[in-house]
Amino acid sequence: MENTLVKSLYRETDKYVDQKVQVSGWIRNLRDSKVFGFIELNDGSFFKSVQIVFDTELDNFKEITKLPLSSSIRVEGKFIATPTAKQPFEIKAEKIEIEGLSDSDYPLQKKRHTFEYLRTIAHLRPRTNAFSATFRVRSIAAYAIHKFFQERGFVHVHTPIITGSDTEGAGEMFRVTTHDMNNLPKGEDGQVDDSKDFFGRETNLTVSGQLPAEAYALAFRDVYTFGPTFRAENSNTTRHAAEFWMVEPEIAFAELEDVMDLTEDMLKYAMKYVLEHAPEEMEFFNKFVDKTVLERMNNVINSDFGRITYTEAIKVLQESGADFKYPVEWGIDLQTEHERYLSEQVFKRPVFVTDYPKDIKAFYMRMNDDGKTVAATDLLVPGIGELIGGSQREERMDVLVDRIKELGMKEEDYWWYLELRKYGGTKHAGFGLGFERFLMYITGMGNIRDVIPFPRTPGSAEF
């Protein structure tokens, strides 16, 4: 008999009423009495489970009543509508086959577990409601972002994980080497000789796909990357991880205004798509994780995003009379408290802050005419502060070279990046969205470790 997905039972209920069906899945809960019992069966295809009713007509009734949680079974039975009951339908079992037994020490028993504890069993946590919802939404949101760009003719570029360049110029990168740590090759100066390493030079895990994406934008016009990035920051916070995913579009013949428009369109599209395609999961988050999630998302979807320059924002903050922990003066990098004040108290909606001081932004951002600020923007949203950072890239070769030298970086490390300006360079712009930060925003999950299947953080690389 053909297997039916639980998702199909929920989406096409009328089609199955009074029909014989077969479902397979794992036992989430089991209650029994002497003559009948109930199984809550989840097959992974849908957030909700299906109720199986079984009784002593089954030859293996007693064996079924003793099954531990998470045992896998195959059930054949009649699909019955139950409109007056708690659940809309159930399956009256005529046959239950055991596919795989679970041990009685299965750690996810029928009680509440803390997220901290569930991180220690990350291989099992997707079986819980919270993480089933989280990682299905992660999948749907990722698809929505791809769909957004593909519908607009963007080319998806697979940028390298192993790189010889540091996009941010911050130096907090993971080294990639095949050197024997107990027998490092040394040069005449006593330093490690990287020419003897696998790639013949120092290489690292990428912190961003932006620079290679720029190369492809100057051939395909509109491109995007969506892949893992790595930061060797020793930050043990709820918002930092050593491995995370970035969405990075790059558009040619474009300025800062264009990239802000693209940012707003993408964010609204992805949120609408998730609300439409994961209603059960979003209802769960809004009820059990963060009761403001749906209100927050609808605020973003239905708002025209505000725009204000950094200089204007500093003035607004200084004149606000608010008691900030971090003093406000021109030149500071805005802290979360400042960002949230602007988006929550001043604009009451998402807002782009533009034209930041050059000293707090990356080398590749286009210098403004004032020589003090760059064509950069951060999107601030109510609830968390900064969500997305973008900029117009510096297309003028001489200005870019001066900036690289000013920051003490090696011009030769960026030879190919500079050549993009040499051979038909043009104005172009892009942004970066930390995918996990976006997921935290739309789910209400408060820790980045809980929106990545197997988080990598300082001192932790289990699984």
Swiss-Prot record:
Q: List the disulfide bonds.
A: none
Q: Which domain of life is it from?
A: Bacteria
What GO molecular function terms would the record report?
asparagine-tRNA ligase activity; ATP binding; catalytic activity, acting on a protein; nucleic acid binding; transferase activity
Has the keyword ATP-binding been applied to this entry?
yes
- Read off the InterPro entries from this record: Aa-tRNA-synt_II (IPR004364), aa-tRNA-synth_II (IPR006195), aa-tRNA-synth_II/BPL/LPL (IPR045864), Asn-tRNA-ligase (IPR004522), Asp/Asn-tRNA-synth_IIb (IPR002312), NA-bd_OB-fold (IPR012340), NA-bd_OB_tRNA (IPR004365)
Q: CDD domains from the xrefs? A: AsxRS_core, EcAsnRS_like_N
Please tell me where this protein is predominantly located.
Answer: cytoplasm
Localization recorded for this chain is: Cytoplasm
Q: Which residues form the signal peptide?
A: none
Q: What class of enzyme is it?
A: ligase
Q: What is its EC number?
A: 6.1.1.22
GO biological process terms, semicolon-separated: asparaginyl-tRNA aminoacylation
Write one Pfam family the protein is assigned to.
tRNA-synt_2
For this protein, the record's Gene3D superfamilies field holds:
Bira Bifunctional Protein, Domain 2 (3.30.930.10), Nucleic acid-binding proteins (2.40.50.140)
Catalysis: reaction(s): tRNA(Asn) + L-asparagine + ATP = L-asparaginyl-tRNA(Asn) + AMP + diphosphate + H(+)
Output a single Gene Ontology CC term carried by this record: cytoplasm
Residues folding into a coiled coil are none
> What keywords were assigned to this record?
Aminoacyl-tRNA synthetase, ATP-binding, Cytoplasm, Ligase, Nucleotide-binding, Protein biosynthesis
PANTHER family linked: ASPARAGINE--TRNA LIGASE, MITOCHONDRIAL-RELATED, ASPARTYL/LYSYL-TRNA SYNTHETASE
What family does the database annotate? Belongs to the class-II aminoacyl-tRNA synthetase family.
Q: How does it assemble?
A: Homodimer.
Q: Which NCBIfam families match?
A: asnS (TIGR00457), PRK03932.1 (NF003037)
What name has this protein been given in UniProt? Answer: Asparagine--tRNA ligase
In the UniProt record, what gene is named as encoding this protein?
asnS
